[in-house]
Amino acid sequence: MNKKLIISLSILCVVIAVYLLNSHFQKTYNSSSKNLMNITEEGLKKIIIQSGQEAIELIKEDSVWNIAGNDTLKIKEQVINRFFDIASKIEIQNTMTSNKEKWSKYNVDDSSGVHLALIDMDDKTINYYVFGRSKTDFTRCYARINQENEVYLLSENIIYNLQSNPTFAAFS
């Protein structure tokens, strides 16, 4: 009886020690996710979106965003607000590749990607992104940042908010 009690207490001590070690190591684990875009609408003058041969240039005049070269179509304020809201929440989840040869697999090469340039008040490009569609998960997408080779998996799919056709219904 005494031997069974000692064995039981020993097992209990081992389980408690494993639990405490696990808790300690879990506290030291840090997530590596970070925000993709740290932008505000106030610092931007232009947004250029290009997909294939189509491109659209959005220009901020005073506090209103307009489509360059188009007097009849107006951008709804809610479309711009939704873009900045989604853009501020997107996180980089994983690095998928650093190999330029694999860009086409993630649809972030120059011909198949959706390009986004953010230009400040001094006409300098502050950020340049190439987004690619995921073939398996339509709620997320891939991105290259500022002409770097790394391709990242993002937490959300922003491509649906990047329409390069000015007659797209959200802009009319």
Indicate residue ranges for each PLM-predicted region.
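Secondary-structure "cap/kink" motif recognition
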Residues: 1-172
